[in-house]
């Protein structure tokens, strides 16, 4: 509930997200992201203020995930940050799990090990196997170790 006690609601109100959605006639979308900052999951990014990084925008009329490019466009329009996009390729170039695990390694600007990477098609592809759009997370094994 918007009781101004939730850090997420405070962020949404401060950044006028609801108003921006209405101003841009985007009341038919759902925006999903990662909320980060002080007091949240050890604040691995070492942020001084809460921040929200968008990773999915869904059209609620069709219940379909929007493409990477449409998501970027909406985030720019609304003044929202997206999760960092490290790589965009037309073809999936990784040949095996070891290559993916190596690609998932890395550190945040804070010096902490990053959690890993998420791999998705540029245009959402529905999978009957998982009953939803394809998406795969590859964890950084170094992240799983105690720091």
PLM region descriptions:
Residues 1-147:
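Core nucleotide-handling region used for phosphoryl-transfer chemistry
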């Amino acid at each position: 509930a918007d009781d101004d006690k939730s850090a997420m609601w405070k962020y949404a109100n401060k950044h006028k997200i609801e108003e921006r959605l209405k101003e841009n006639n985007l009341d038919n979308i759902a925006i999903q992201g990662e909320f980060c900052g002080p007091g949240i999951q050890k604040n691995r990014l070492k942020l001084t203020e809460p921040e929200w990084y968008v990773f999915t925008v869904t059209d609620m009329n069709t219940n379909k995930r929007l493409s990477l490019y449409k998501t970027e466009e909406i985030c720019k329009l609304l003044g929202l940050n997206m999760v960092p996009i490290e790589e965009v390729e037309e073809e999936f170039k990784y040949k095996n799990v070891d290559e993916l695990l190596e690609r998932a390694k890395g550190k945040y600007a804070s010096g902490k090990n990053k959690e890993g990477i998420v791999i998705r098609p540029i245009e959402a592809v529905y999978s009957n196997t998982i009953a939803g759009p394809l998406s795969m997370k590859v964890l950084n094994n170094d992240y799983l170790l105690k720091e």
